[in-house]
Amino acid sequence: MMKRQFEDVTRIVIKIGTSSLVLPTGKINLEKIDQLAFVISSLMNKGKEVILVSSGAMGFGLDILKMEKRPTNLAKQQAVSSVGQVAMMSLYSQIFAHYQTNVSQILLTRDVVVFPESLANVTNAFESLISLGIVPIVNENDAVSVDEMDHATKFGDNDRLSAVVAGITKADLLIMLSDIDGLFDKNPTIYEDAQLRSHVAVITQEIIASAGGAGSKFGTGGMLSKIQSAQMVFENKGQMVLMNGANPRDILRVLEGQPLGTWFKQIEEVRHD
């Protein structure tokens, strides 16, 4: 087994999905958010630079507006996300403050990173915030993003957004928290003998084909989007860990080299024992 080496990792992007922030009841998982804030603050205190890509605006909005289902109308979806984004950032700010960590909000659309001038501006914003010891919290700007063929400004989901942010900021590692343990050789909800892949060095067509499927009730990203994100990370010569977000403290164990989740790193860059 390849040994994971994260001693030289300084800049980390952590992506947390809606399914990790919102309980099956639709209520906000306050305990999970508190644990995440503790872990990120602990990493910051150790000299790490952390960027958080957080889904959840829709889930927060549904909770606040006491709506049981995600609206099908685009304008209503944008309205619910807009309400939820404010609530989510307010909660993040309060909980991170408990650990004496300051946070900021960056809302992105795809066109911001496509055009060189706006890309340079957002890159400078990230660097300035990081230099001030602030944790940038990133989400897609759902209230204004569109997915029209002639002017598509959506990333698709926050799995891909996190890979884009990792590329923009030249992060050493992307940690993707999800409601699954990692990438399996086949669907673990169907096959009892499914095996977790500890390390993926090459994303094959077989892996892509087996990664189909939708996201959670409150989110949009499925396994395919996570594989596509890993491909983007590979293109930027980076590395990614896909792991279960049930216990955010496991992030610390991963950074110690423990083999949790699936580690995506190209084989030519892997050091052997």
Swiss-Prot record:
Coarse class of the protein's main subcellular location: cytoplasm
Gene Ontology terms, MF aspect: ATP binding; glutamate 5-kinase activity
SUPFAM superfamilies: Carbamate kinase-like
First-level EC class: transferase
InterPro entries (UniProt xref): AceGlu_kinase-like_sf (IPR036393), Asp/Glu/Uridylate_kinase (IPR001048), G5K_ProB (IPR041739), Glu/AcGlu_kinase (IPR001057), Glu_5kinase (IPR011529), Glu_5kinase/COase_Synthase (IPR005715), Glutamate_5-kinase_CS (IPR019797)
Residue ranges the record marks as coiled coil: none
Compartment(s): Cytoplasm
Gene Ontology biological-process entries: L-proline biosynthetic process
EC number(s) from the headed UniProt entry: 2.7.2.11
Annotated metabolic or biological route of this protein: Amino-acid biosynthesis; L-proline biosynthesis; L-glutamate 5-semialdehyde from L-glutamate: step 1/2
Catalytic activity: L-glutamate + ATP = L-glutamyl 5-phosphate + ADP
Annotated residues for binding of substrate: S55, D142, N158
Annotated Pfam families: AA_kinase
GO cellular component terms attached to this protein's record: cytosol
Stored Gene3D superfamilies: Acetylglutamate kinase-like
Keyword set includes ATP-binding: yes
CDD domains linked to this entry: AAK_G5K_ProB
The keyword Repeat belongs to this UniProt entry's keyword annotation: no
Keywords in alphabetical order: Amino-acid biosynthesis, ATP-binding, Cytoplasm, Kinase, Nucleotide-binding, Proline biosynthesis, Transferase
Residues holding ATP: K15, S178, D179, T220, G221, G222, M223, L224, S225, K226
Family annotation (HAMAP family): ProB (MF_00456)
Summary of the function given for this chain in its UniProt record: Catalyzes the transfer of a phosphate group to glutamate to form L-glutamate 5-phosphate.
UniProt record similarity statement: Belongs to the glutamate 5-kinase family.
Protein name: Glutamate 5-kinase
Organism: Streptococcus pyogenes serotype M4 (strain MGAS10750)
High-level lineage: Bacteria, Bacillati, Bacillota, Bacilli, Lactobacillales
